Amino acid sequence: MIETNTFGATTIAQDDYKMPELAREMNLAAAKLAKQACDEFSTPDKPRFVAGAVGPTPKTASISPDVNDPAVRNVTFEQLRQAYKEQVEALYEGGADVFLVETIFDTLNAKAALFAIQNVCKEKNIKMP
């Protein structure tokens, strides 16, 4: 299993660097590179697979960024779902065989990532483990 280097490659995460428009390209390129490596070293006895990494964002849907106002949120579930959906689509297009949702400490963010994966799989009729 080769994991893509896309841990922080969502539009939300890349917005901190003023590069949200590059998120799709990052995911697509990372998946293609991982797929090339898998293809190069796969054998019938030892197949290799691409795990598209889907990681946390710097914004959380469950935790307030303002200790003085615990009701404040700096991102919505829908914004997270859409950002993860864009990431998952590009990872799949680039050759990801599975998606690895990792180290997302906010369970609502993780739920958005899982919903995005479900949405993409349903829309594209993808069957994945």
State where each predicted segment sits.
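Domain-level signal for soluble alpha/beta catalytic cores
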Residues: 1-129
